[in-house]
């Protein structure tokens, strides 16, 4: 859960300047949680039946008079990595930001259609976006650690949500999950700004997972990193999918092929052209347009 600047490579898509994911101390009062969504029960059912955890139906998004997404029908499975690829301005980051309602921060944005998380339409009037963002964390393109210590960065969301019992253990667990603990365990009081870019991004991932969300959204999480740091992030994403549903936007098709289970291909005009198992998308796509894009004939 972050509150810093959000950026995107999709130059035609407006981006919110801040994430207002502040939390109330008592999550029991949040409308989303009051919908009686049983996380454990839902997870079990989804795992047994393959029911999607996120599902859009005829989803359309506009920025003023410009349509960014056109009638998107997409079902994202639980505890897998789903990649979204496509040329700049195709709407993939717009879709990502719809999932936890980050587009609410753009005045000109308008959303039509349905987008369900665990069976509940996230755009229903009784859904609190702040409560939604507690369960759907986000990691941005550029690392954005707070100007605080490494420890305080990870503890930030826990303190806001009044989850301070055993906080040291929770911070350690999050850092271990993010494959950062061994590198920072003896310098938790060090400023997060002194970390390398790759370490900062893993710290942001630790901060996001510390509050134990159900879904992690990632918008180009490795685009600003060197190849070694990128490899660590990719390995981490595959590990995170054992516990979380991961949705990643990437311009790097090789990255999508390496780490994702499912791939959605968006093309110019905000159209979802194909969604399937990643191997099938890259080896035998149904759409000629998708094949042309993947082979570099356009886009």
Swiss-Prot record:
Record has Membrane as a keyword: yes
Q: Where is the ABC transporter domain?
A: 54-294
Q: Looking at its record, which EC class is this enzyme?
A: translocase
Query: Which Cys pairs does UniProt list as disulfide-bonded?
Result: none
Q: Which UniProt keywords apply?
A: ATP-binding, Cell membrane, Membrane, Nucleotide-binding, Phosphate transport, Translocase, Transport
| Compositionally skewed regions (Low complexity) per UniProt | 10-27
Binding of ATP: at which residues? 86-93
The answer to keyword Membrane applying to this record is yes
Q: Which CDD domains match?
A: ABC_PstB_phosphate_transporter
Q: What does this protein do?
A: Part of the ABC transporter complex PstSACB involved in phosphate import. Responsible for energy coupling to the transport system.
Q: What is this protein called?
A: Phosphate import ATP-binding protein PstB 1
Q: Which organism is it from?
A: Haloarcula marismortui (strain ATCC 43049 / DSM 3752 / JCM 8966 / VKM B-1809)
């Amino acid at each position: 859960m972050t509150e810093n600047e959000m950026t995107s490579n999709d130059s035609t898509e407006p981006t919110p300047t801040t994430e207002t994911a502040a939390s109330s101390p008592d999550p029991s009062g949040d409308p989303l949680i009051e919908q009686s969504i049983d996380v454990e029960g839902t997870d079990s059912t989804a795992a047994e039946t393959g029911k999607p955890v996120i599902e859009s139906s005829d989803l359309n998004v506009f920025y003023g008079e410009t349509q960014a997404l056109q009638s998107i029908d997409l079902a994202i499975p639980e505890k897998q990595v789903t990649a979204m690829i496509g040329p700049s301005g195709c709407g993939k980051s717009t879709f990502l930001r719809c999932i936890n309602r980050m587009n609410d921060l753009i005045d000109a944005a308008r959303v039509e259609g349905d987008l369900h998380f665990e069976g509940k339409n996230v755009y229903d009037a009784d859904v609190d976006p702040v409560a939604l963002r507690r369960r759907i964390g986000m990691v941005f393109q550029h690392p954005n650690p707070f100007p605080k210590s490494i420890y305080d960065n990870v503890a930030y969301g826990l303190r806001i949500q009044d989850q301070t019992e055993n906080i040291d253990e929770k911070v350690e667990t999050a850092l271990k999950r993010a494959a950062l603990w061994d590198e920072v365990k003896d310098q938790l009081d060090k400023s997060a700004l002194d970390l390398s870019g790759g370490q900062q991004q893993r710290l942001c991932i630790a901060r996001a997972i510390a509050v134990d969300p159900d879904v992690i959204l990632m918008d180009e999480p490795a685009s600003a990193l060197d190849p070694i740091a990128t490899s660590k992030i990719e390995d981490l994403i595959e590990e995170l999918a054992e516990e979380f549903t991961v949705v990643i936007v990437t311009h790097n098709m090789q990255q999508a092929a390496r780490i994702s289970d499912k791939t959605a291909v968006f093309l110019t005009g905000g159209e979802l052209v194909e969604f399937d198992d990643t191997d099938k998308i890259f080896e035998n796509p149904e759409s000629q347009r998708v094949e042309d894009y993947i082979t570099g004939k356009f886009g």
